Structures are given as C-alpha cells and as structure tokens.
Amino acid sequence: MSITAERKAELIKTHARGEADTGSAEVQVAILSERISNLTEHFKTHKKDNHSRRGLLKLVSQRRSLLDHLKKADQARYQDLIEKLGLRR
C-alpha cells in the first residue's frame, strides 16, 4: 500500500521547487495524492477494511489542509498544482 522509494523520488523530482526541495507543499500534496490513490485501489478489493479507511480519511484531511495553505499563500502555485495532479478543485 505504501509507495516505493523510487516512486517517491520521482514525485519529489517532478514537483520540487528547487534542487533539494523535499518538503514544500507541492511535494507533500503530490506524495499524499499518490498514497490516497493507492489506498483507493486497495478498497476496491477490501471493502470492509475500516482501519485503513480511517487512515485514508486522515490523509485526505492532511492534503486538504496543505492545499488550503497553498491557496492562501500563492494562488498561481495552487492552480498549477491541482492541474498537474488532476484534482477536482
């Protein structure tokens, strides 16, 4: 269910704002989005896994908080990120 180190490095490389950037809001949202999509796939076969469902809700909430912060800080970066990730908003 977790993402591999290679996939995480790839996400960091594509969404980083600088050379050594691993903690910007864009990178964190991209990693959370990947984890959320992995869990969503997991629930297609394991419908009664309520323990993991709680974790999914926490991840979604954390991503929402980061997106809200980014939207307040820099609207252009926010719009660019949601277009890149294909999020609804």
UniProtKB/Swiss-Prot annotation:
Skewed-composition ranges (Basic and acidic residues): 1-20
SMART domains in the cross-refs: Ribosomal_S15
One GO CC annotation: cytosolic small ribosomal subunit
GO molecular function: rRNA binding; structural constituent of ribosome
Biological processes per GO annotation: translation
Highest taxon, organism lineage: Bacteria
Region: Disordered, residue numbers: 1-24
Keywords: Ribonucleoprotein, Ribosomal protein, RNA-binding, rRNA-binding
HAMAP family: Ribosomal_uS15_B
Known function: One of the primary rRNA binding proteins, it binds directly to 16S rRNA where it helps nucleate assembly of the platform of the 30S subunit by binding and bridging several RNA helices of the 16S rRNA.
Subunit structure: Part of the 30S ribosomal subunit. Forms a bridge to the 50S subunit in the 70S ribosome, contacting the 23S rRNA.
Homology family: Belongs to the universal ribosomal protein uS15 family.
Protein name (Swiss-Prot/TrEMBL): Small ribosomal subunit protein uS15
Organism: Phenylobacterium zucineum (strain HLK1)
